[in-house]
């Protein structure tokens, strides 16, 4: 009798543990990260564009939080994407510039660049915790795409992937370079953002119903070569100065429609109640006619200085919208938030919300913003730092610390531009001196017009010392090929 009672007690305890674990799993959020490509800070209606209509994103912002000071991990695509997925500066991962397709060896070893297998991503952690995981859209984290020489999306936790190495080709219209789980998808009719939305919706319909999910939607729009549906272009001909500009306006609008279709599918599948949605861009807008296929790149930086490939604000300050139905505090719904956040924050935030502990030895550059999503202030102890050795402007180094923006040249601007760091060039960047310090008060000078470095000497000394520490910390941990 005593043994029977002990058995029953043990059974009750075991059942309680299982129920508790299942309840915990049920409470974990689904996560959808939506990433645009070269979207300007001023390209959305809710960020002030005078012509482009983005009703879906307007609603996401109205029912969520719109951030004014959201940053990408880099002012260019590949390093930005690596930073978003890993929560680490792309310099630590050894991705310094956009990654070309590895057609032949080049002297600076750029053909070798890829996100190395040792890197752990959001998808890696979530897949290990029982999440269903999916990538649809642009990958751009390796040079040997869909080849055995380098790791592919499934190596980094994506159990289903439908992607391109870089841009949709030959344009957004009827792309023919998508790969689905290692097999060429062939020619596809339609426009890239809608093709990506189709795949995302189909995956949501087919995935295991009892698993939470992580869906990474990486649109190609509005990166060149821009192509948009004629009927949407026609809607913007009166607002645009040229047909090419109308093409760009329609490109952003078509992306908004694609987001709307995915949102409707979440509602139809009863997945909207506990899905955290994060919308942002990989970097700022492309400069019109910087090269031939940028003839339709009419992206707007809004009030910010510079464009893509710059270390001034427009290079990496981007749209940032977070929506989490029934989970954000009511006081935050529909607010415009001035807290500094970064795409580097996604991994620690999402993992915390999924009740995952990260390895102590993992050197993260992002900060969990979970407390912010709960209605509290965010204490960001570590400043944001960018080192882009191929920047169009001469300041290769930038830092955001509290309200302050710091820019610096390397060796007075004499350090050669670099698209990759090799064992030969690594000593150059490690020994380089930060010079020509500029400081801007972004609270009062969003456009970076008034350099106060020579006005406030005490502040300049403090921020310069901080920048030097952060620079050395990063370059000493930067990977060389």
Task: List PLM regions with ranges.
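Bacterial N-terminal signal peptides that target proteins for export
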Residues: 1-11
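Bacterial N-terminal signal peptides
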Residues: 9-19
């Amino acid at each position: 009798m005593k043994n029977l009672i002990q058995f029953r007690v043990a059974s009750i305890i075991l059942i309680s543990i299982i129920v508790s674990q299942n309840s915990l799993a049920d409470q974990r959020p689904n996560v959808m990260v939506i990433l645009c490509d070269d979207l300007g800070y001023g390209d959305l209606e809710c960020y002030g564009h005078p012509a482009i209509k983005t009703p879906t994103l307007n609603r996401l912002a109205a029912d969520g939080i719109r951030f004014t000071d959201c940053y990408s991990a880099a002012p260019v695509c590949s390093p930005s994407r690596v930073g978003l997925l890993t929560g680490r500066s792309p310099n630590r991962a050894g991705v310094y510039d956009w990654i070309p397709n590895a057609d032949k060896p080049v002297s600076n070893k750029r053909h070798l660049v890829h996100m190395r297998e040792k890197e752990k991503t959001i998808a890696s952690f979530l897949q290990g915790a029982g999440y269903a995981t999916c990538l649809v859209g642009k990958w751009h984290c390796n040079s040997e795409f869909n080849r055995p020489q380098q790791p592919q999306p499934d190596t980094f936790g994506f159990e289903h992937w439908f992607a391109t190495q870089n841009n949709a080709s030959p344009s957004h219209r009827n792309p023919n370079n998508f790969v689905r789980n290692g097999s060429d998808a062939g020619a596809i009719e339609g426009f890239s953002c809608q093709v990506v939305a189709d795949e995302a919706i189909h995956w949501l319909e087919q995935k295991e119903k009892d698993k939470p999910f992580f869906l990474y939607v990486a649109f190609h729009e509005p990166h060149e070569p821009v192509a948009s549906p004629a009927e949407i272009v026609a809607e913007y001909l009166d607002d645009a100065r040229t047909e090419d500009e109308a093409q760009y306006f329609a490109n952003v609008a078509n992306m908004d429609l694609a987001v709307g279709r995915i949102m409707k599918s979440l509602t139809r599948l009863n997945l909207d109640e506990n899905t955290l949605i994060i919308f942002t861009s990989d970097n700022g807008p492309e400069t019109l006619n910087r090269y031939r296929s940028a003839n339709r790149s009419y992206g707007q930086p809004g009030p910010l200085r510079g464009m893509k490939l710059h270390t001034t604000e427009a290079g990496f300050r981007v749209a940032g919208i977070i929506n989490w139905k029934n989970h954000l505090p009511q006081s935050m719904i529909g607010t415009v938030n001035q807290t500094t956040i970064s795409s580097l924050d996604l991994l620690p935030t999402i993992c915390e919300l999924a009740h995952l502990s990260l390895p102590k030895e993992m050197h993260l550059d992002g900060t969990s913003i979970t407390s912010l999503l709960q209605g509290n202030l965010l204490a960001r102890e570590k400043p944001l730092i960018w080192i882009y050795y191929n920047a169009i402007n001469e300041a290769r180094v930038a830092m955001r610390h509290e309200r302050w923006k710091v820019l610096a040249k390397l060796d007075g601007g004499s350090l050669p531009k670099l698209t990759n760091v090799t064992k030969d060039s690594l000593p150059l960047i490690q020994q380089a001196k930060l010079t020509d310090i500029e400081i801007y008060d972004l609270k009062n000078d969003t456009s970076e017009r008034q350099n106060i470095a020579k006005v406030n000497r005490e502040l300049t000394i403090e921020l310069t010392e901080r920048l030097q520490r952060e620079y050395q910390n990063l370059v000493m941990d930067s990977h060389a090929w």
